[in-house]
């Protein structure tokens, strides 16, 4: 060690514990265009000031540790440290605050969601000084966004591949999710695609189990795709789940799907992990495969209002890591999803530029520059009576996916698909004619029933089905008043 280094490291050094806010709370800081910005919902332990809690989050997710260390003198903390630059109380909550933290871009490896999350949502979430901590939103700067490939293809390329425009895409998850043989599974795929669906889907927990090995499933599903395409004249697809126990096995399954000539594969991106997902997304772009993403495990992370991570952050991370579709809730079905919050992260998935809008839970303006968009998938407890609302809420650039709402039709799988396709076409036509789907939706469906006995039967079966439970993760009561 040189004398100069020894002198620099020893000047002003004193071992011991000091308050985080002395170094990491900087309300005078002006954020840079290259900073990654984070909004944390912080619940300090009793007796911990919010400034100290916010500073602790900034410190423990960047350069800080619990004590002063002499090696601080060997680097430029002012250049590399995270900074808590603003704190505001959460309306209606006595002990919760939103802490805004800015991170210098040099803290993160280029093109790595894994590294970004290891810092920002790492050990700090177990910090004893905090009763709870939730990451509400991230601002990803263009300088960092440009280091990612993002979705393999994006919305427009997918529409061109499928030759389908001017309406939402229509899908179905094959049920029962577990237990079918590969041949019976392929039969269900064929019947649904022949009936008018664009896609069918492996359920997220269908991988390669004793009752149905992955290779057999891929072969029977490919046969179903080609047979239904020949009979309908439409391009069809089935989300073949390539998720596996190792990255090598996952890629092997994707390679086999490509060799079969199918258009799309699938991945469970949270249980599979971001490193695996990014690897698969790169393979899909290089080999012309679309990539459908399921979000299994998300509610473990995002459902509680005061701890974890909001799904809008997971959605942004997926757009960076890569996926052409991702499940995004339904608002009207059986799964959790506040309407305004859902619309907020749907825009973050699809649009190139999204303005800050606290009424929809968007804390920062997000510029995606040239990163392709992702189609949101509405799936979970939906049926034909929901079609007007889904068409109105999600618009054309979406996938509406009915599992039980197709396979539960009293006449069988193909009639279930017919019912959904007729309902969708009726809603799109009515919307294009200027009718209000939110007001006239039920009437539009009833009119279509006159021309489709399959739809009439579906409407009769599901006329009483409701999922009327309150949303747990709601927006804060006065969020709409925040600029």
UniProtKB/Swiss-Prot annotation:
Binding-site positions, substrate: 123, 173, 177, 295, 327, 379
EC number annotated for this UniProt entry: 4.1.1.39
PTM comment: The disulfide bond which can form in the large chain dimeric partners within the hexadecamer appears to be associated with oxidative stress and protein turnover.
A Pfam entry, by short name: RuBisCO_large_N
Catalyzed reactions per annotation: 2 (2R)-3-phosphoglycerate + 2 H(+) = D-ribulose 1,5-bisphosphate + CO2 + H2O; D-ribulose 1,5-bisphosphate + O2 = 2-phosphoglycolate + (2R)-3-phosphoglycerate + 2 H(+)
Propeptide positions: 1-2
PTM-bearing positions, type N6-carboxylysine: 201
Entry-annotated residues carrying Phosphoserine: 208
GO biological process terms on file: photorespiration; reductive pentose-phosphate cycle
Keywords: Calvin cycle, Carbon dioxide fixation, Chloroplast, Disulfide bond, Lyase, Magnesium, Metal-binding, Monooxygenase, Oxidoreductase, Phosphoprotein, Photorespiration, Photosynthesis, Plastid
Phosphothreonine PTM positions: 330
Necessary cofactors: Mg(2+)
UniProt-annotated site: Transition state stabilizer, residues: 334
Top-tier EC class: lyase
Subcellular localization, as worded in the UniProt entry: Plastid, Chloroplast
GO molecular function: magnesium ion binding; monooxygenase activity; ribulose-bisphosphate carboxylase activity
Any one GO CC term of the record: chloroplast
Residues at the catalytic site: 175 (proton acceptor), 294 (proton acceptor)
Note: The basic functional RuBisCO is composed of a large chain homodimer in a 'head-to-tail' conformation. In form I RuBisCO this homodimer is arranged in a barrel-like tetramer with the small subunits forming a tetrameric 'cap' on each end of the 'barrel'.
PANTHER family referenced in this protein's UniProt entry, alphabetically: RIBULOSE BISPHOSPHATE CARBOXYLASE (PTHR42704), RIBULOSE BISPHOSPHATE CARBOXYLASE LARGE CHAIN (PTHR42704:SF16)
Function: RuBisCO catalyzes two reactions: the carboxylation of D-ribulose 1,5-bisphosphate, the primary event in carbon dioxide fixation, as well as the oxidative fragmentation of the pentose substrate in the photorespiration process. Both reactions occur simultaneously and in competition at the same active site.
Family assignment from sequence similarity: Belongs to the RuBisCO large chain family. Type I subfamily.
Subunit (UniProt): Heterohexadecamer of 8 large chains and 8 small chains; disulfide-linked. The disulfide link is formed within the large subunit homodimers.
Name the record gives this protein: Ribulose bisphosphate carboxylase large chain
Organism: Aethionema cordifolium
Source organism phylogeny: Eukaryota, Viridiplantae, Streptophyta, Embryophyta, Tracheophyta
Primary gene name: rbcL
